[in-house]
Swiss-Prot record:
Any one annotated GO CC term: plasma membrane-derived thylakoid photosystem II
Region Disordered, annotated ranges: 212-233
Keywords: Coiled coil
Residues in coiled coil: 183-204
Record protein name field: Protein Thf1
Record function comment: May be involved in photosynthetic membrane biogenesis.
Coiled coil recorded as keyword: yes
Entry superkingdom: Bacteria
Length: 233
């Protein structure tokens, strides 16, 4: 019998693949995403789908905004995926494909499609997966899947997701069509949006602190380089 990989195994693999240090404010983001993906990957009811992939990519890209050095971001993402024995290119490609579909559709058509009220021809593979999800009583729902659905709405019509009434109605329709818990779905997305706001605020505070620190250093350097006039005799 094959032993299931543990969270420790996954973390060990990640840090073997990405050996550069990770900035403190982002380390928690990276580890929480990695642990969430790990726990799903070892769940017997979980199966990969493009909407989940979009949720993973969106979560990483949004919460890693502003990360320095910028060139390390793709290495970190790649290491996360490989640590849970997944292909990072597959996640990126599926995410890009779904975003392109969402951007090409009026939001009402997208909601009807996601809620299985209508069948559209833009992506036969996604259509088949949506039907399979709706018909699978053991479908393993996840927060990352919810974020993927939310991202599709956001890509189709950014104004809709900012309007509480329209957003709530769209999410209820999608949850009903895919047989998801509306309460769980809504709460997960509220938490996601709240955490994004907190991360934005934390980054703004950090940027202000770095600016203030730089100004202090510049002042000290200026004072050190200013010649002191000799005292008058």
């Amino acid at each position: 019998m094959e032993l299931l990989r543990t969270v420790s195994d996954t973390k060990r693999t990640f840090y073997a693949l990405h050996t550069r240090p990770i900035n403190t404010i982002y380390r928690r983001v990276v580890e929480e995403l990695m642990v969430e993906m790990h726990l799903l990957s070892v769940n017997v009811d979980f199966s990969y789908n493009p909407i989940y992939a979009l949720g993973v990519v969106t979560t990483f890209d949004r919460f890693m905004e502003g990360y320095q050095p910028e060139r390390d971001k793709e290495s970190i993402f790649s290491a996360i995926c490989q640590a849970v024995e997944q292909e990072p290119q597959r996640y990126r490609q599926d995410a890009e494909r779904l975003q392109a579909v969402a951007q090409s559709l009026p939001v009402n058509d997208l909601v009807a499609w996601l809620s299985q009220a209508n069948h559209l021809q833009q992506d036969a593979d996604l259509q088949a997966q949506l039907q399979a999800i709706a018909n699978n009583s053991n479908f393993k729902y996840s927060r990352l899947f919810a974020i993927g659905l939310f991202t599709l709405l956001e890509q189709s019509n950014p104004d809709l997701v900012k309007d509480e009434k329209q957003r709530t109605e769209a999410l209820k329709s999608i949850a009903a069509g895919l047989h998801l818990s509306d309460d769980k779905f809504s709460k997960d997305l509220e938490l996601y949006r709240s955490n994004l706001d907190k991360m934005t605020q934390a980054l703004a505070v950090m940027a202000d602190m770095l600016t203030a620190d730089r100004k202090k250093r510049e002042q000290r350097q200026q004072q050190a380089s200013t010649p002191v006039a000799p005292p008058n005799e």
